């Protein structure tokens, strides 16, 4: 049984609303981080066509988006062939304070792009700062670091989830 788009979307938005009901800032930071991945890739590619040194920050933005993918979707660390150094580097960010610092550093790098020219990369800088603030609030409030509960394939007992788990097992 194939997954339909409506099933996937309802599972994603169901997980999204379930996460927001928990009132945990680390979950908010994770969702902002996931959205920032899309922004990094889109705005990094869009700004790469500037005829100035902004190209450097565009490339950095694309690389940041790819690194954030591995930080926010740890499942990819298991299925992608990566070096042990990179994997251990990414695993350092499994708590609120390290993620706060990580996103703050990413934000500062993109804020520095404003020294060259004002571009849409400021949006990426703002969202990195928001993610950092969410992780900082979670750490200050002593909230447990949680990972999002959304499951694209559905609930654990559903047929779609079993098919998704079977595919993952075959990949691994």
From Swiss-Prot:
GO terms for biological process: vesicle-mediated transport. GO terms for cellular component: Golgi membrane. Keywords: Glycoprotein, Golgi apparatus, Membrane, Transmembrane, Transmembrane helix. It is a multi-pass membrane protein. Glycans are attached at residue 24. The keyword Protein biosynthesis does not apply. Its main location: Golgi. SMART domains: Cg6151-P. It is found in: Golgi apparatus membrane. The chain crosses the membrane at residues 29-49, 51-71, 97-114, 120-140. It holds the Pfam family Cg6151-P. Belongs to the TVP18 family. PANTHER family: CALCIUM CHANNEL FLOWER HOMOLOG. Golgi membrane protein involved in vesicular trafficking. This is Golgi apparatus membrane protein TVP18. It comes from Meyerozyma guilliermondii (strain ATCC 6260 / CBS 566 / DSM 6381 / JCM 1539 / NBRC 10279 / NRRL Y-324) (Yeast).
């Amino acid at each position: 049984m194939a997954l339909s788009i409506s099933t996937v979307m309802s599972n994603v938005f169901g997980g999204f609303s379930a996460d927001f009901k928990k009132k945990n800032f680390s979950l908010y930071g994770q969702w902002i981080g996931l959205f920032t991945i899309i922004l990094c890739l889109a705005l990094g590619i869009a700004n790469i066509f500037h005829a100035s040194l902004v190209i450097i920050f565009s490339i950095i933005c694309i690389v940041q988006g790819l690194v954030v993918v591995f930080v926010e979707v740890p499942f990819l660390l298991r299925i992608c062939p990566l070096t042990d150094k990179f994997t251990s580097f990414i695993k350092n960010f499994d708590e609120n304070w390290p993620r706060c610092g990580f996103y703050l550093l990413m934000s500062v790098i993109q804020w520095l792009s404003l020294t060259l020219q004002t571009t849409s990369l400021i949006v990426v800088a703002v969202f990195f700062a928001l993610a950092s603030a969410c992780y900082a609030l979670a750490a200050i409030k002593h909230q447990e670091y949680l990972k999002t509960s959304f499951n694209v394939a559905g609930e654990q007992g559903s047929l779609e989830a079993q098919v998704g788990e079977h595919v993952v097992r075959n990949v691994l």
